[in-house]
Amino acid sequence: MMSPHSTASDRYRDAGFDAGVNASDQRDGGGTAVAEPCDAFGRSAIHDPRGDATAGGPAVEPRNENGAAHWADLDWPSVIWIGGVHLAALLAPFYFTWSGLAICLALYWVTGGLGVCLGYHRLLTHGSFQTTKPMRFLFALLGGVSGEGSAIDWVANHRKHHAFSDQDGDPHTPRDGGWWAHMLWIFPQHTREELAAHTKRWAPDLVKDKGVVFLHKTFLVWHILLGSALLGAGWTFFDRFTGVSWLIWGLAVRMVIVFHITWLVNSASHMWGYRNYETTDDSRNLWWVGLLAFGEGWHNNHHAYQRMAAHGHRWWELDPTYWVIRGLESVGLAWDVVHTRHGISRKPPLQTAANRA
């Protein structure tokens, strides 16, 4: 679910973000097959919320098999980014404060739950609901400060994962190794040509979204601003030790937690757990990942019905992300919510000029 090039935004400046998508790049159908007759619903929202990608498309895309040739060239920006965050998190025991822990947990929900699970995944990748432009920008921003790459990177990789789930072409299948699926797939280097073809094919809607492109190009800026705010606030209102504590716990520790919980959806939820639906991939429902990842761990349910806003399909499969979507819908900030396995079951709220802004 995470981008392999989250910190290399400069490599995309010549990647053709203004390029459009041809009708030949889309078709109906595709994706993960299920035993139930849900093709019209369950197999949508891979290429964009209204269609799928073809088996053809650009000839050059990032390679994703776990092979020795990959390790000839590493994507050093990603290695340094992820490695540096983990090293910084090792300082956490020496700068522990209860307020730092509280900030860590709060930002874990804000960036991981609202940003990644709700924003990147259910809204931008699958179109499980619609919202206003300001809210869409906000969720994309929160997803970005999770540290998992820009929305363009993240969504492109995840849509490709659904199109080739646990088959040749899946960026992170455990069939290539558990650690590969968990995090090693992020590090091999890709050329600008490969990256441009990849994003054009799998995220053509987002590369034409000015707000999302802006967040992509300013990915690192938001982390610098957040880190400065945490350090400055703790230092100003308390002391230097508290400022450093807030920085380490609110940025580094929180990012490591969000990283690995997201990665567990890619790895553990394709290896262990139970299945409610007979799909053509290895997706599983894993209760503890479901709890840690705000409902994302009910992964077999999701692969069976990809656009469905609710990932928990049984009463005891808790899905906090869906609860937030329901809350947004109740106040008119979400509509066209895909509530059921057969599509949108409720009429959208009356639209006004304000919530269309």
Task: Give the location of each predicted region.
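C-terminal accessory segments of proteins
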Residues: 258-276
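Short amphipathic alpha-helical surface patches that serve as generic macromolecular interface elements
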Residues: 262-265, 285, 302, 321
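Active-site-proximal inter-transmembrane loops
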Residues: 203-210, 272-298, 304-305
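Short glycine- and Lys/Arg-enriched binding-loop motifs that mark or flank ligand-binding interfaces
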Residues: 111, 115, 269, 291-293
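Catalytic glutamate of the conserved HExxH
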Residues: 109, 122, 267, 271, ...
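Non-catalytic, topology-defining segments of multipass membrane proteins
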Residues: 1-263, 308-357
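Short Pro-Cys-Gly-centered "Cys-loop" motif that presents a nucleophilic cysteine in a tight turn
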Residues: 3-7, 269-272, 294
